Amino acid sequence: WPATSKQLQSSSSEKLSYNDAIAAANRTVSEDTSNTDVRSECRSIIKTHGKKTTKAVMMIHGVSACPQQFADLGDTFFNAGYNVYIPRVPSHGLADNKRHGEITIPAMAQFMNSSTSIISGLGDETGVVGLSGGANMATWITQYNSQTISRALLLSPFYQPSASETPSWKVPLLQNLYGRNILPDSFTGSNLSYRALGKYIIIANNYKSDLKAPGLKYVGVVTSENDTAIDKNLAVNIPKQMAAASGAKFQYYSIPASFGIGHDIVALNQDEVKKHADKLYPFYLDMYEGKDVKLEAN
């Protein structure tokens, strides 16, 4: 099978005016609201100051999650003056959460492009924050929409599973047999769809060969020492190479094991994240803005 996919080799996003961007965002929210399959807490979120702001940010949730994952961190950015857009990834946040395995490559491409069009009109400087599979999408968006995205914060980026989760020889099977819907769907112990995971791996295989994102000024990466789900070498090296190829500043931080935080380092429904949110959330904002910061020791 070819590793590339035509829909993932270019972007169809467009620059929108503030009014057009707001109209498109509101349409997305109302479509989620009228879709009875979408859980009420999982609808797309738009938070604006009633006008185009100096800075705007888009936040993309992880595999099998939904916008609720970023709702609270979104408030931190909003209170710092940002317009914030947190779109729901297709097939996610549904009453039957296993249906996230129904996601398709064309739907993912369309989502990334339309979401980027919306954020383009919300601020003078626009960027993206992503968690896990959302950070994978953010990496693609940054390369193919570089005239829009100037900064990215990639949290626990999922480009490939860790060897303990999926031995490396199994990754092509995950990508080709599940990612291309040849095998019926199956689920991990934490109810992640193999078909969905395979498609995120396909996205990563469609990054630009040189990873260059012209217009990118800054990339920050945060992982947790306790995260056993992702390939951490790729989680750091792909963004680092993208920053180097683009002449952008790069910063990386690993949350110490003492914090007790695993793969999801954002959502407040994770007890340890909630416990440390007063340290973590301002830290994520500073990391996004490229400040030289460290997390206060636990």
Stretch-by-stretch model annotation:
Residues 94-122:
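Catalytic nucleophile-loop/oxyanion-hole region of alpha/beta-hydrolase
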Residues 6, 149-198:
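Hydrolase active-site cap/lid region
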Residues 37-92:
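Short, surface-exposed "cap/lid" segments of acyl-processing enzymes
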Residues 243-266:
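Catalytic histidine neighborhood in serine/cysteine hydrolases
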Residues 215, 221-227:
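Short beta-strand/loop motif that positions the catalytic acidic residue
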Residues 262-298:
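Catalytic active-site module of serine/aspartate enzymes centered on a nucleophile-bearing elbow/loop
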Residues 73, 217, 231-243:
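Short alpha-helix in the alpha/beta-hydrolase fold that links the catalytic acid
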Residues 129-138:
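Gly/Ala-rich beta-loop-alpha elbow adjacent to hydrolase catalytic centers
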